[in-house]
Amino acid sequence: MELKLNRKYKDTLFRKVFNNKKDLLSLYNALNNTEHMDDSLITITTIEDAIYIGYKNDISFIINSELNLYEHQSSVNPNMPVRGLIYFAELYKGYIDQNNLLIYNERIVKMPFPRYVVFYNGTEEQPEEQELRLSDSFVQVPEGEGLKDTAGTEADKTNKPSVEVVVQLLNINYGCNQELMEKCQKLMEYSKFIALVRVKSDMLTEKYKKEMKSVNKKEIFAEAVALAIDEAIRDNVLKDILSKNMAEVTDMLLTEFDEKAYIDGVKKQSYEEGEAIGEDKLARLVVELKKRGRVEDIAKVTDEGERERLYREFNI
């Protein structure tokens, strides 16, 4: 099965909500416990004409000598620090070019301080806050093979990497991070609206199930979005955005729905392919062990660590 997704980038609702400096400043203040009032302090640096790893970063901006990268995600991706590395490299390159900084000069070049925040509102249970690190992706250097200092001793037994990216992952599902929500009205309203869409979707799914009607998930979701928009406008939730951009918001959410369905499909396909490969490897391992009369080791293959050790031993 070949899975396809239209890679033409469309704005997310999150980016739409925070596309003006006033609301973006409110979000920044809430995250950093600051009280800036002048939104002219913000310089938008979002890369508008490039898509990295199939996805464009949502919002990046400079304020107070800080380079902030904000991104919305409906699934937790452990490779977000890798994406962050690529984003920041491009953003800093642009900053150096724009400011005519001489990086080959003897004088140190001053750069804005990086901050990377990902706002998560998927359906999987996640803690309110967590950190993801680029160093978790690095292959660890075996003990004793670290850098040596001039005396020939190990300079750093922990083999600290030369590059690091830290992602602050915040759960913004309704009911999470209440203190943050209370400091940023727009974030609270965004969280409420997404929760409302899900409630309507669950309600319609149950309704059509009872009525024994055959309605596909996307049609149910589209109807749920329409109902949620009407109710949100009545309740003054994102009213300014929803009332003026109803069709655009609907299109954004349906696009996000398609992307989620695509990602879920890729995960399922990868899992099935992985299972098939795993079964083949295991069968080959058992054959090798039987050939060598190592019956006691066959019982050990149920342990993942032992299994991986045996794979390496037999180069499988």
Question: Could you say what each language-model-derived stretch is?
Answer:
Residues 1-316:
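Elongated, amphipathic alpha-helical interaction scaffolds
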